[in-house]
């Protein structure tokens, strides 16, 4: 009995060691490509990113070209440690250090004033720089091995549904792009973005780290800037995160009526419901994968039931509002 148990444990250790060796080789290959100015895709806890050497303007331009992304739409810089901030930000205010100590590594992006020498291609030509320290172990291993910052927007065509699985990235970019496997993304929605370039912090994009949690850590409320009064950040355009099939957002409780109306008009529709009691974190984790699945069904429209209006649904509600082509 004891020897059998020991044999099982030995086998598991061998499998784990072999898996670690394979991943180490893949990360080494990714680092080689990054240093050569090429692009790689890798997992984070939010979505899969399309990475480039953040110090290489030519590589950064490749990101914009491959995604079809406007050159004025900034990229998020990914770092391994908060200690690296001083190389990228002109100043690191105490508020930034407080939030980093509480929420990094994790799905929080801070917008700071950029340091001299930071490429315009990284910031979309504006002064502020957006930066975060991801929590996913593969992302962290890649950043540690690379030894510098990696710029990484979501690994999809601009404006489309973000990828939360390696297979999603390959669907977007079937050519010879190295994709590091990391399983399904744990969070599934993009990071919360907070600007600290002024005296009062501003919430620029909602995420799973809530405004209330940020305010509690800082001891002050966050402002929501008016349109055009804040730095440009990823995912801030009115139309974004959209499947190719037009998406219609339907008020809660009216999905059945919307289905009947669409079918009476001869439409083939697919649906995504949000039943009472649905957990916000689970919904957000699965949202993009489900939208991608529905997008392949050959329907004329995707009908999505609106999510609750409570604070824990802010991120999902924001993404659906931007993904929607029409509203009921």
Identify the residue ranges that each predicted region occupies.
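Active-site-adjacent structural elements in enzyme catalytic cores
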Residues: 14-328
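Polybasic, lysine-enriched low-complexity intrinsically disordered terminal tails
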Residues: 4-7
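Intrinsic-disorder-associated, low-complexity terminal segments enriched in Asp/Asn/His/Tyr and depleted
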Residues: 9-11
